[in-house]
């Protein structure tokens, strides 16, 4: 295996790790409620706030990523994760825990953006498709493994175990990135974000699609956040098992992506969208009623 391939796999694992950070502690939300003795709303707010900050970082950093030192930016992101993970693991104060978790989101937002940019630069024209496919596999695996890993660690060592685990992994990755050669992305070679023309902001189709995407992900993450509490309070399912029950949701998302590739070759995109939205609404209502 060449040094270039090793770098590609390291970058892919960095993207996996960033997604792991985001999803790993969702299964222990009921336990956090007991640990910190604060309203469940504030526990859930750390989940929503984390995702919001990650999204903002993509917008803020995406415009200038090409002109920055890639290695320094990656080390900065990992450094933020190290500091915040240490504080989250050590503190018993919810305010400090929440601030550190939201601070962690900044590092989590930096890592995947830089890794994607570097993957596009380091891979050759012939190998770029394979590199992007591997990147997508890493991203797809994280939401599937994170709840299981989080519930396993959380059941035994609570949130301290989860953030200690993140601390150790982030330190190892920091040292690896520090000692390997990471090239800079030359300005203008890779452009991840295109300027959105003003006409799109008043286009009804564009606004409709963005709104639909927002509502779908709002529902998706609402269910993810609510599921641990539902399983614990209604069905008396412990943290150790609840993480496994996240797996069907993640697998369904992956299968949906695979099915779309096949369906798009046979059916019109608008028809697929209509059927998908209708089915999503029906099954969401069934989830609430049943």
What residue ranges belong to the model's regions?
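Helix-loop-helix hairpin linking two adjacent transmembrane segments in secondary transporters
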Residues: 133-178
